């Protein structure tokens, strides 16, 4: 092997913030459905501990063997709304606490899948599960939630959009941090290893290993070597860098699966930033040529970055999946925070950026007095982008009681610090209150 390639890999880890962001075990809980919530909860806890008992130990051993940091060890499970048909509200709470306790018992960082898929309609159990979010997200430590309210095939469930906006307001009144643990999706994927939106799809194996890589700092350092070169050279440099990053993810994921006796699922190529300087997607975009992220040209630069990441990744692995692109969470990215404080980056610009990247309006703090209908309308706008363009979009928005524009909130750790961003004050209430269903686009009709 070329010694320069070895040195490059060492430098990626030691100087450029490269890491495996997550090794996530997906576990099907469909065989855990019991006669009531209590029995389902007991079966859920037993299966998770049985399947994932050695996940953390195995990942830590691979960290030592290869010197590659694995930041998070996580679990995703079957959407809980599919398990809880026989449960009442108290039964749902018992299942939630069993999931949280199982995650703690096996030592993982997070467990995702307290979720509902309601893009076309909602069952009584699904409505009850959403109603439980304020209590569940404020009383559990490791549990993550998601809702899928739209898809290209189904259109947008505006009733669910309205209910979700009201639920987000209720969560914020109990604990604003609870909304950092809830993602609202259009076109959610079944094999996403990243939180808070991970769940284990019904078409997946009984248990599987998925990996999420991360390397904004590696991409930024690579682009520093091609300053003043044409944009074609920039795209090629990102592509070759993504190839190297993905190969490491493929290696770690495959070995983890082999050691645990499970099938290997996918590598998610997403560039996931952290609040640390030098580990920022915004800084990558600025290295492409923007004075500050959010200025004119940002959407074009992000499209280039996202596309080149995908092209490099699919050359490195046959098993690419999840969201696979660039994440733009405001509170988790030092460059995004700077641009927000400077007034360069707005919610409207972030919405435009989501049309060409992996996710959506992510980790955005807004004034505590924002109406629920405005939050619902933000979700509807993001869903429209995803539905029309046949891609995943999402919203993770955090109303902060008592805070207004100019203030900020510090979530700590990887969640970072969020400046309070302004929202448009004109009302969307009449639109959201119409309810019903926004039809699927004509191009979704393919049969």
Swiss-Prot record:
Homodimer. InterPro entries: UPF0210. This is UPF0210 protein OEOE_0945. It holds the Pfam family DUF711. It comes from the Bacteria. Belongs to the UPF0210 family. HAMAP family: UPF0210.
């Amino acid at each position: 092997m070329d010694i320069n390639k070895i040195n490059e890999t060492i430098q990626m880890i030691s100087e450029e913030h490269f890491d495996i962001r997550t090794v996530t075990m997906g576990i099907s809980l469909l065989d855990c459905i019991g006669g009531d919530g209590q029995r389902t909860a007991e079966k859920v806890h037993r299966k998770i501990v049985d399947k994932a008992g050695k996940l953390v130990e195995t990942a830590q051993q691979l960290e030592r063997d290869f010197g590659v940091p694995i930041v998070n060890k996580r679990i995703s499970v079957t959407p809980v709304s599919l398990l809880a048909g026989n449960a009442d509200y108290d039964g749902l709470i018992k299942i939630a606490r069993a999931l949280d306790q199982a995650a703690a018992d096996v030592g993982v960082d997070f467990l995702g899948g307290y979720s509902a898929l309601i893009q076309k309609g909602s069952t009584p159990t699904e409505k009850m599960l959403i109603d439980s979010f304020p209590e569940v997200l404020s009383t559990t430590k490791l549990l993550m939630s998601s809702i899928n309210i739209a898809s290209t095939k189904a259109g947008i469930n505006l009733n669910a959009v309205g209910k979700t906006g009201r639920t987000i307001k209720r969560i914020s009144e109990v604990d604003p941090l609870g909304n950092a643990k809830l993602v609202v999706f259009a076109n959610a994927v079944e094999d996403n290893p990243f939180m808070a939106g991970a769940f284990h799809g019904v078409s997946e194996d009984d248990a599987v290993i998925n990996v999420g890589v991360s390397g904004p700092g590696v991409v930024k350092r690579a682009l520093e070597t091609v300053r003043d070169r044409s944009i074609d050279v920039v795209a090629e440099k990102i592509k070759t860098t993504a190839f190297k990053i993905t190969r490491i993810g493929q290696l770690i994921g495959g070995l983890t699966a082999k050691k645990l006796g499970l099938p290997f699922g996918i590598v998610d190529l997403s560039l996931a930033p952290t609040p640390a300087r030098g580990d920022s997607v915004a800084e990558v975009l600025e290295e492409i040529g923007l004075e500050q992220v959010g200025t004119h040209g940002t959407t074009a630069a992000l499209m280039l970055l996202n596309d080149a990441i995908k092209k490099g990744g699919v050359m490195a692995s046959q098993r690419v999946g999840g969201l696979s692109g660039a994440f733009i969470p405001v509170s988790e990215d030092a460059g995004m925070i700077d641009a927000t404080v400077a007034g360069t980056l707005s919610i409207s610009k972030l919405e435009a950026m989501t049309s060409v990247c992996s996710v959506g309006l992510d980790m955005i703090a807004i004034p505590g007095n924002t109406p629920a209908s405005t939050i619902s309308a933000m979700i509807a706008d993001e869903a429209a982008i995803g539905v029309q363009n046949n891609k995943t979009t999402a919203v993770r928005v955090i109303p902060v009681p008592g805070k207004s524009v100019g203030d900020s909130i510090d979530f700590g750790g990887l969640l970072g610090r969020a400046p309070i961003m302004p929202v448009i004050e004109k009302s969307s209430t009449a639109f959201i209150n119409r309810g019903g269903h926004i039809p699927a686009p004509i191009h979704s009709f393919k049969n």
